[in-house]
């Protein structure tokens, strides 16, 4: 649970940086695969960033948890992410 909260906070910070007018496409791709991709596609999206073994294990655990959510819950998460990105706070 702490890892999930940390990832959400970091993600929101990156999305809403005052100095940034764009969201990093790689981050969006990784988050999209976390929510809607297969475990292997999610792992593949992380490889360009050379995660160490602890990072791989942590993200694997997170993906396993996310995959227990219903399709409706996953869709709602993606919708919320888009609302956040498009909100005035992130403009």
Curated annotation (Swiss-Prot):
Organism of provenance:
Bos taurus
User: Family assignment?
Assistant: Belongs to the secretoglobin family.
Chief location category: secreted
Q: Where in the cell is it found?
A: Secreted
* InterPro entries the record matches: Secretoglobin, Secretoglobin_1C-like, Secretoglobin_sf, Uteroglobin
**Keyword set for this entry?**
Disulfide bond, Phospholipase A2 inhibitor, Secreted, Signal
Asked if the Swiss-Prot or TrEMBL record annotates the protein with the keyword Secreted, the reply is yes
Q: Which GO terms describe its molecular function?
A: phospholipase A2 inhibitor activity
Recorded protein name is Uteroglobin
Point out the signal peptide segment. 1-21
Q: Name one GO cellular component term.
A: cytoplasm
Biological role stated in the UniProt entry:
Binds phosphatidylcholine, phosphatidylinositol, polychlorinated biphenyls (PCB) and weakly progesterone, potent inhibitor of phospholipase A2.
Q: Name one Pfam family in it.
A: Uteroglobin
Q: Name one GO biological process term.
A: signal transduction
Please give the subunit comment from the record.
Answer: Antiparallel homodimer; disulfide-linked. Interaction with LMBR1L is controversial.
């Amino acid at each position: 649970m702490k890892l999930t909260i940390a990832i959400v906070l970091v993600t929101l910070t990156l999305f809403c940086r005052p100095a940034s007018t764009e969201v990093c496409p790689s981050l969006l791709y990784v988050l999209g695969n976390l929510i809607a991709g297969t475990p292997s596609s999610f792992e593949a999206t992380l490889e360009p960033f050379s995660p160490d073994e602890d990072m791989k294990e942590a993200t694997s655990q997170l993906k396993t948890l996310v995959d227990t959510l219903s399709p409706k819950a996953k869709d709602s998460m993606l919708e919320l992410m888009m609302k956040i990105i498009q909100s005035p706070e992130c403009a």
